[in-house]
Amino acid sequence: MAQSEDMTRCISLCMSCYQTCLGTAMNHCLETGGKHVEPKHFRLMMACAEMCRTAAHFMLINTPHHRHTCGECAEICTECAADCERVGGMDECVSACRSCAQSCGAMAA
């Protein structure tokens, strides 16, 4: 069964968010320190990255369970976007998380 355009776009947004969150955490937050490495914030970024990767994986294998992973991904991405905005200096992460959350929310519906 072929993927819909919406699913293909969602997979792309999930992978982009995965790359952005993980890359920002490892190359920006760890180097910047301070509130960027607060355990709650850093764990949230790691959870967000991994959930995005997992949601993309579930869509790629075309399991109907992707609705569950996409729902959780939307929730975590929304929380991560808000926390990255709170910490500051992470506009790329905020944008990637919001785009992914919106797309995953639609896939979960």
Segments from the language model and where they lie:
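Amphipathic alpha-helical hairpins
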Residues: 1-109
